[in-house]
C-alpha cells in the first residue's frame, strides 16, 4: 500500500476525532512532508487559544509500530515539549502507549513501513 503526503494529511484530519475526543481541542489543518522522516506542522484550537505543533518522527515496525519523535507545541507565546503534552493527552488511550522516547502502537497487521520521496509505503503481513 502506498500513501501520498496529501492522503496522509486527510487521514490524520479524519482520524483525529477518534484518538483525541476533546470538544475544546480541534485540529484545523495539518501539513506533512515525507523524506526519510515525517515532518509535521499542525494548527489546533486548544480551548480557544491558537496552538501550533511542529514535529519530526521516524517510524519503525517490530512487534509494535514504534514512532520516535521530537517536537514543540507553541501554546500562545509559551513553548511546550511535545512529548510531555502527548503523555498527558494519551495516558488513558488504550491503543497508544507513550514512553519517554517514543509512541508504541499494537501491531498485528503491518510488516514494514518505509518513508521516501513524499510517500509512505506499507507492507502488510
Segments the model singles out, each with a brief description of its role:
Residues 1-125:
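Extracellular/lumenal and peripheral-membrane lipid-interaction modules
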Amino acid at each position: 500500500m502506498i500513501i501520498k503526503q496529501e492522503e496522509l494529511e486527510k487521514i490524520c484530519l479524519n482520524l483525529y476525532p477518534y484518538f483525541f475526543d476533546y470538544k475544546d481541542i480541534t485540529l484545523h489543518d495539518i501539513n506533512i512532508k515525507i523524506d526519510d522522516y515525517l515532518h509535521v506542522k499542525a494548527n489546533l484550537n486548544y480551548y480557544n487559544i491558537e496552538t501550533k505543533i511542529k514535529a519530526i518522527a521516524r517510524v519503525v515496525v517490530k512487534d509494535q509500530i514504534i514512532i520516535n519523535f521530537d517536537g514543540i507545541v507553541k501554546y500562545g507565546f509559551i513553548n511546550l515539549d511535545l512529548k510531555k503534552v502527548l503523555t498527558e493527552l494519551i495516558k488513558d488511550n488504550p491503543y497508544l502507549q507513550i514512553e519517554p522516547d517514543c509512541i508504541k502502537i499494537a501491531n498485528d497487521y503491518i510488516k514494514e513501513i518505509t518513508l521516501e520521496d513524499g510517500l509512505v509505503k506499507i507492507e502488510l503481513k
